[in-house]
């Protein structure tokens, strides 16, 4: 069985929590895109794990894989492995595999990313972690791959080949080109290469072999649908494809092998950084949602902008991903709000729309059309079953399900592993 999980909004939907919940039924969990510009927070008991590269399935018995569509900062990977080992969780080559073709984020990528963002008159909200520049080099065939990182001779030869051009690019951006051949940084990367040598694998072959043997494989996305580099709200997007089809392309698995595509959907909507958010709540109500939901980025710490549930954006996400089921998160955060609003469409230049316009600039001008539902006052964080929810909370979930026309199978009412239940 092959299952793909993606975020249906702008990221931060709670993918890590749901992956952690479901991973017990899977033999392999694989990350297929992005880098350490995304973050998952998983709570197990009193322990909190903040992950940026290693798939959330690491906390259970699954083998976890990092596919070749990821851009990997080896320093971040080393820190995550050390964090787990500090908690008594061994992350050896039997537990974690990294594809030999995975692109490496070099120190100069991070430098160039920061310089470019600072030079923009209008910021796009990059995390300045070198993600975009690593993807640029992948497309330009100027990348470093994991296979080169773990081979000192190849690594140094590749650096000599690429260094002159990278030094020129950094100088053009107003930076110090010495970072490209900094001896201390080179030595550190060679050390990291030795550390990761045993982790190298062929992710496509490993996943296809597992599927042939009847095993269960989960592909885990980072970010969210509307941050997709092609279909998202350009230019306020990430540098990779975040939708379900990307899992097949990046992991090297044929689309006919996909059995399920699960959407992770927040009961409201949030966005980090710049870009349109038609239902955005400003002032006291927006701050209340932000505080109640703990809406601060795992990666950047930036406060997330909050808004009411946006159905047109969800309709587009459903079309782009082909979802078979939905996991609804953070329902508890809406407690105490009355009414609770659902954006069912937009008005744009005198027209009524039930689907987002193609251009980002047009989406920014859309005004939401709302349907109001009565709220509830009961704390939901101890609820263990759908029938235990207050009537108005159940009605809200049912109405979302009706509007999205995709079944909601799981509901989350808190950050802990035990605070998610199946809707039956």
Swiss-Prot record:
BP terms from Gene Ontology: 'de novo' AMP biosynthetic process; IMP metabolic process
Protein's pathway: Purine metabolism; AMP biosynthesis via de novo pathway; AMP from IMP: step 1/2
Binding positions (Mg(2+)): 12, 39
Binding, IMP: 12-15, 37-40, 127, 141, 223, 238, 302
Provenance organism: Methanosarcina barkeri (strain Fusaro / DSM 804)
SUPFAM superfamilies the UniProt entry points to: P-loop containing nucleoside triphosphate hydrolases (SSF52540)
Requisite cofactors: Mg(2+)
Catalytic activity annotation: IMP + L-aspartate + GTP = N(6)-(1,2-dicarboxyethyl)-AMP + GDP + phosphate + 2 H(+)
UniProt: substrate binding residues: 298-304
Free-text function comment from the UniProt entry: Plays an important role in the de novo pathway of purine nucleotide biosynthesis. Catalyzes the first committed step in the biosynthesis of AMP from IMP.
Pfam family, one: Adenylsucc_synt
MF annotations from Gene Ontology: adenylosuccinate synthase activity; GTP binding; magnesium ion binding
Name of encoding gene: purA
The family this protein is said to belong to: Belongs to the adenylosuccinate synthetase family.
EC numbers: 6.3.4.4
Subunit structure: Homodimer.
Cellular component aspect of the GO annotation: cytoplasm
Compartment(s) where it occurs, according to its Swiss-Prot or TrEMBL record: Cytoplasm
Signal sequence extent: none
Domain of life assignment: Archaea
Note on cofactor: Binds 1 Mg(2+) ion per subunit.
Record's keyword terms, sorted: Cytoplasm, GTP-binding, Ligase, Magnesium, Metal-binding, Nucleotide-binding, Purine biosynthesis
Catalytic residue positions: 12 (proton acceptor), 40 (proton donor)
Binding site for GTP: 11-17, 39-41, 304, 330-332, 412-414
Protein name: Adenylosuccinate synthetase
């Amino acid at each position: 069985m092959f299952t793909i999980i993606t975020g249906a909004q702008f990221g931060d939907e709670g993918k890590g929590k749901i992956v952690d919940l479901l991973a017990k039924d899977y033999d392999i969990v694989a990350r297929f895109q992005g880098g350490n510009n995304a973050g998952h927070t998983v709570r197990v008991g009193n322990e909190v794990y903040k992950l940026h590269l290693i798939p959330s399935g690491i906390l259970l018995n699954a083998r976890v894989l990092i596919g070749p569509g990821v851009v990997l900062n080896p320093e971040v990977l080393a820190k995550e492995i050390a964090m787990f080992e500090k908690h008594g969780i061994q992350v050896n080559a039997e537990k974690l595999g990294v594809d030999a073709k995975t692109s490496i984020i070099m120190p100069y990528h991070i430098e160039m990313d920061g310089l470019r963002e600072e030079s923009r008159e209008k910021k796009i909200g990059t995390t300045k972690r070198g993600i975009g520049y690593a993807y640029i080099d992948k497309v330009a065939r100027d990348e470093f791959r994991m296979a080169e990182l773990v081979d000192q001779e190849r690594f140094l030869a590749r650096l000599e080949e690429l260094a002159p051009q990278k030094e020129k690019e950094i100088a053009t951006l107003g930076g110090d080109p010495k970072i490209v051949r900094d001896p201390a940084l080179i030595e550190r990367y060679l050390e990291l290469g030795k550390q990761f040598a045993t982790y190298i694998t062929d992710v496509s072959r490993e996943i296809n072999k597992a599927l042939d043997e009847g095993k269960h494989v989960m592909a885990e996305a980072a970010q969210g649908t509307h941050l997709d580099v092609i279909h998202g709200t350009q230019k306020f997007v990430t540098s990779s494809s975040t939708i379900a089809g990307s899992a097949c392309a990046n992991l090297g698995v044929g689309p006919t092998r996909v059995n399920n595509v699960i959407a992770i959907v927040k009961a409201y909507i949030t966005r980090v950084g710049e870009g349109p958010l038609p239902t955005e709540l400003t002032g006291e109500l927006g701050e209340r949602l932000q505080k109640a939901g703990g809406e601060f980025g795992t990666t950047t710490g930036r406060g997330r902008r909050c808004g009411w549930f946006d159905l047109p954006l969800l309709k587009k996400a459903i079309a782009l991903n082909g979802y078979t089921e939905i996991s609804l998160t953070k329902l508890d955060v809406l407690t105490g709000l009355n009414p609770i609003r659902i954006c069912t469409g937009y008005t744009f230049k005198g027209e009524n729309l039930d689907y987002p316009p193609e251009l980002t600039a047009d989406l920014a001008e859309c005004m939401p059309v709302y349907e109001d539902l009565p709220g509830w006052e009961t704390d939901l964080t101890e609820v263990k079953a759908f029938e235990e929810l207050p009537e108005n909370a159940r009605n809200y979930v049912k109405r979302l399900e009706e509007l999205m026309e995709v079944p909601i199978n799981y509901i989350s009412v808190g950050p802990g592993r035990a605070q998610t239940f199946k809707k039956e």
